[in-house]
Amino acid sequence: MLQTTLLYLINPLAYIIPILLATAFLTLIERKILGYMQFRKGPNIVGPYGLLQPIADGLKLFIKEPIRPSASSRSYFLATPTVALALALLMWMPLPLPHSIINLNLGLLFILAISSLTVYTILGSGWASNSKYALMGALRAVAQTISYEVSLGLILLSMIIFAGGFTLHTFNLAQETIWLLIPGWPLAFMWYISTLAETNRAPFDLTEGESELVSGFNIEYAAGPFALFFLAEYTNILLMNTLSVILFMGTSYNPLMPQISSLSLMMKASMLTVLFLWIRASYPRFRYDQLMHLVWKNFLPLTLAIILWHMALPLATTSLPPLT
C-alpha cells in the first residue's frame, strides 16, 4: 500500500520537476538569443556564461514581498496565478514522452479543453486587479484565445482524420513511414501560427503589449504570483511545441531504447521553441484587426476546405474498382 502511494506521488513529481527546470532555462535561452540578435551579450554575469541566471531570477521573485492592490479582489487575485500554472502542467499528462502518465482515449480533446480553461485565469487576473490596463489586456486575451482555438480545433480535427484516432500514441504509429508534416504542410503552417497566438507570443502579444498596456493583464502582479504566471506562459510554449512535434513530426518508439524517442522528441521541440524566440526578435506586433482578420478571413475558410477535402477523398476513392 505504501509503495503504491509513493509511486503515485513520485511519478507526477518526476514528470513536473524537469518541465519546470526546462521552463526556467528557456527564459535564459530567450534572453541569450534576443541578445545575440540585437548584437549584445545577454546575461553573462551570474555563474559561468550566465547559466545560473534563472536560479537568481527565481530566488529574487519568490523572496520578494507580494504586493496586492488595496482595491483588488483578494481571493481571485491570488488564486488565478496558481490555477494558471496548475492547468499548464495538467496538459502535459497525456503527452507520450514516450510514455504518458495517463493514457486517455481522447487525449487531444483533453488538451484542447484544458487549454481553453486558461483564458479564465487571464480574465480573472485582469478583473481581480481592478486596473483598466489589466482588464483591457484580459479582454483582448479572451477574444484572441477563443478566436484561435477555433482554427486549432479544426486543424486537430483534420489531423485526427489523417491519423485515424484521438490518442496521441496513434500519431506516432501513423508516422512510422512518413511525417504528417509532408502531406499536411498547409495545416502545419497554420497550426504553428495559431500556437503563437494561443500562447500570446510575439507578433501576437497584444494581451501584454508593453508599448500599449504597460504590461497587460499581469501589471498589478509582483514577486511570487508574477513568477507563477511567467512559469505558466513558458510551460505552455514548451507544451505547444512538443504537441506540434507529436502531431506533425512523430517519433517512432523503440522498445529496446525508449530514451532515443525522448531525445529525438526533445531536440525537435527545442528547434521549434528556438523558432518561437527567433520570430519574437524579428517581427513587430500585429494590429488587433489584422490579428482577427488572419483567423476569421484566412485560417477558418482554409481549414474548413481542407477538412472537407480530407473527408471527401477517402469516400470518393472507396467506390473505385480494384486496379488489377
Swiss-Prot record:
Domain of life: Eukaryota
GO CC annotation, single: mitochondrial inner membrane
Membrane topology value: Multi-pass membrane protein
EC number: 7.1.1.2
BP GO annotations: aerobic respiration
UniProt KW Kinase keyword: no
A single GO molecular function term of this UniProt record: NADH dehydrogenase (ubiquinone) activity
Compartments, record wording: Mitochondrion inner membrane
Sequence similarity: Belongs to the complex I subunit 1 family.
Function: Core subunit of the mitochondrial membrane respiratory chain NADH dehydrogenase (Complex I) that is believed to belong to the minimal assembly required for catalysis. Complex I functions in the transfer of electrons from NADH to the respiratory chain. The immediate electron acceptor for the enzyme is believed to be ubiquinone.
Protein name: NADH-ubiquinone oxidoreductase chain 1
